[in-house]
Amino acid sequence: MKATIRFIKISPTKVRRITNQIKGLKYADACILLKFMKGRIAKTILKLVNSAFSNSRYSTFADLRIQTVLVEKGPIFNRFQPRAKGRAYPIKKYTSHIKVVLS
């Protein structure tokens, strides 16, 4: 009963702030918490938790808990911003991989 999403265009530290709050919670409690949470990644994590729930076949709401939520660093995309006198400053676009396991 797991679900993964890869190459999310948000930094892993911002994702971990949200996912650390739902580790160990029951499925229903985590869904309620994520619905009312601020941050643009909360909606994506809610979809991921619902996907992991739909992947489980024989479980009910009462049984399931969020066992682990792994947030791993994805590839970093390098961009450049033009500056004065022909210079350029690097801009790093971070990505994340998220894995949710229910048990």
Swiss-Prot record:
This protein binds specifically to 23S rRNA. InterPro entries: Ribosomal_uL22, Ribosomal_uL22_bac/chlpt-type, Ribosomal_uL22_bac/org-type, Ribosomal_uL22_CS, Ribosomal_uL22_sf. It is found in: Plastid, Chloroplast. The keyword Cytoplasm does not apply. One of its GO terms (biological process) is translation. One of its GO terms (cellular component) is large ribosomal subunit. Belongs to the universal ribosomal protein uL22 family. Pfam families: Ribosomal_L22. SUPFAM superfamilies: Ribosomal protein L22. GO terms for molecular function: rRNA binding; structural constituent of ribosome. Part of the 50S ribosomal subunit. This is Large ribosomal subunit protein uL22c. Keywords: Chloroplast, Plastid, Ribonucleoprotein, Ribosomal protein, RNA-binding, rRNA-binding. It comes from Cyanidium caldarium (Red alga). The keyword Ribosomal protein applies. HAMAP family: Ribosomal_uL22_B. PROSITE patterns: RIBOSOMAL_L22.
